Regions:
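A charged, aromatic-enriched C-terminal amphipathic alpha-helix characteristic of glycosyltransferases
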Residues: 45, 103, 120-150
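Short alpha-helix at the nucleotide-sugar/activated-sugar donor binding site of glycosyltransferases
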Residues: 74
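Cofactor-binding loop segments of dinucleotide-utilizing enzymes, especially the Rossmann-like FAD-
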Residues: 13-15, 37, 85, 103
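A short alpha->beta transition loop at the rim of the catalytic pocket in nucleotide-sugar-dependent
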Residues: 51, 77-78
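Nucleotide-sugar-dependent
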Residues: 39-46, 53-71, 81-91
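Nucleotide-activated donor-binding/catalytic signature segment of Leloir-type glycosyltransferases, i.e.
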Residues: 5, 9-11, 20-44
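Conserved acidic donor-binding segment of nucleotide-sugar-dependent glycosyltransferases
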Residues: 94-106, 114-120
Length: 154
């Protein structure tokens, strides 16, 4: 995959339980940058300039979780590579919001190549923003919650 991506950079922005191990593994690897945690505004700028973002969840742990970085990326008009299970994978695939794959190094690498070369499923920046507004915004979530309450009262 690296040979097909040319001079592309892989930038990790953040923190977390695996941050130090990831930083150690990437030390000395050309084209990999580790940026410590930044403000939400700066993270948005990184996502807006990216070709794609990556979010993952290890299967069998929090399969019900929905990584909010997916929504932050889509709101910036940037496609997502999501490696993991659950509703997020279904949303990415069905909405053509990037690439959903297993948490597998080869599948993630192929997703990166596909989006970098423009061959991955992508609804476009405007379509991604519209999808977030229609399906995962506060307004959309409020409508869904109200429908559940109305149904329970009926």
């Amino acid at each position: 995959a690296r040979a097909r991506l040319g001079d592309a950079r892989l930038v990790f922005v953040g923190q977390g339980s695996g941050w130090e191990a990831l930083a150690e593994r990437s030390r000395g690897v050309a084209g990999v940058d580790m940026i410590p945690a930044v403000s939400a505004e700066e993270a948005d700028r990184w996502m807006a300039r990216a070709t794609a973002t990556l979010a993952s969840l290890r299967p069998g742990g929090y399969d019900y979780a929905y990584p909010t970085k997916i929504l932050a990326s889509l709101a910036q008009g940037t496609p997502v590579i999501y490696a993991g299970p659950g509703q997020a994978a279904r949303d990415i695939a069905e909405g053509e919001l990037g690439v959903a794959c297993n948490l597998d190094v080869d599948e993630v690498a192929e997703a990166m190549v596909g989006l970098a070369l423009g061959t991955g499923a992508w609804v476009g920046a405007g379509g991604a923003r519209a999808w977030v507004s229609a399906h995962r915004s506060v307004e959309a979530s409020s409508r869904a919650a109200a429908a559940v309450v109305r149904s329970a009262l009926a």
